[in-house]
From Swiss-Prot:
Family note: Belongs to the peroxiredoxin family. Tpx subfamily.
Name of the encoding gene: tpx
Residue ranges constituting the Thioredoxin domain according to the UniProt record: 18-163
Family matches, as Gene3D superfamilies: Glutaredoxin
Protein name: Thiol peroxidase
Catalytic activity: a hydroperoxide + [thioredoxin]-dithiol = an alcohol + [thioredoxin]-disulfide + H2O
Catalytic activity, EC: 1.11.1.24
Note: The active site is a conserved redox-active cysteine residue, the peroxidatic cysteine (C(P)), which makes the nucleophilic attack on the peroxide substrate. The peroxide oxidizes the C(P)-SH to cysteine sulfenic acid (C(P)-SOH), which then reacts with another cysteine residue, the resolving cysteine (C(R)), to form a disulfide bridge. The disulfide is subsequently reduced by an appropriate electron donor to complete the catalytic cycle. In this atypical 2-Cys peroxiredoxin, C(R) is present in the same subunit to form an intramolecular disulfide.
GO molecular function: thioredoxin peroxidase activity
Source taxonomy: Bacteria, Bacillati, Bacillota, Bacilli, Bacillales
Organism the protein comes from: Staphylococcus aureus (strain Mu50 / ATCC 700699)
Positions of the catalytic residues: C60 (cysteine sulfenic acid (-soh) intermediate)
Domain of life where this protein originates: Bacteria
Disulfide bonds: C60-C93
Protein's job: Thiol-specific peroxidase that catalyzes the reduction of hydrogen peroxide and organic hydroperoxides to water and alcohols, respectively. Plays a role in cell protection against oxidative stress by detoxifying peroxides.
Self-association state and partner proteins as the record states: Homodimer.
Length: 164
C-alpha cells in the first residue's frame, strides 16, 4: 500500500514497505528521556508495535490503552511509536496515569517510519499501523489502516501476538 486516506483525503506513504514473513528492519527512535533506542534493545522478546499519528488524539489514545491493556497480559513487549516529541509522549503518559506504557518518538529522523513504510508524506506523521514481531524479529502480522482516523483490527493483531 502506498496510499491511504486521512480524514477522507489521499495521503502518500513514504518509505520501504515490509510484509509478513520479512525480518523487521532496525530503527532508531527516542524514549521519553531522549535516550536513543533501537529494535535490538528488545532482542529475544515478541513485540507488538502500535503506530499512531499522534498520542494526543482520541483514536490514538484509545489504541494505545487497548493494546497495552490486552497485550500486557502476555509475555513480550508493547511499543507505541509516533512522531510526537518525547516530551508530549511523557506528558500524555503522566496525565493518563499509565506508568508501564512504552512510548517512543520517531520525530527526529523518521527512521522507524521510513524503514517500515508508514511516513505520511504530506503530514510528516506516521500512519496508523500495527506490526507484530516474533522473538527473532520476523513480521508475523502487519496492518496499515487504510483510513488514518479509523481503529486497527484489535482482534486480529492481538490474536497474532498471543499465538507466537
Amino acid at each position: 500500500m502506498t496510499e491511504i486516506t486521512f480524514k477522507g483525503g489521499p495521503i502518500h506513504l513514504k518509505g520501504q514497505q515490509i510484509n509478513e514473513g520479512d525480518f523487521a528492519p532496525d530503527f532508531t527512535v527516542l524514549d521519553n528521556d531522549l535516550n536513543q533506542v533501537t529494535l535490538a534493545d528488545y532482542a529475544g522478546k515478541k513485540k507488538l508495535i502500535s503506530v499512531v499519528p499522534s498520542i494526543d488524539t482520541g483514536v490514538c489514545d484509545q489504541q494505545t490503552r487497548k493494546f497495552n491493556s490486552e497485550a500486557s497480559k502476555e509475555e513480550g513487549i508493547v511499543l507505541t511509536i509516533s512522531a510526537d516529541l518525547p516530551f508530549a509522549q511523557k506528558r500524555w503518559c503522566a496525565s493518563a496515569g499509565l506508568d508501564n506504557v512504552i512510548t517512543l518518538s520517531d520525530h527526529r529522523d523518521l527512521s522507524f517510519g521510513e524503514n517500515y513504510g508508514v511516513v505520511m508524506e504530506e503530514l510528516r506523521l506516521l500512519a496508523r499501523a500495527v506490526f507484530v514481531l516474533d522473538v527473532d524479529n520476523k513480521v508475523v502480522y502487519k496492518e496499515i489502516v487504510s483510513e488514518g482516523t479509523d481503529f486497527p483490527d484489535f482482534d486480529a493483531a492481538l490474536a497474532a501476538y498471543k499465538n507466537i
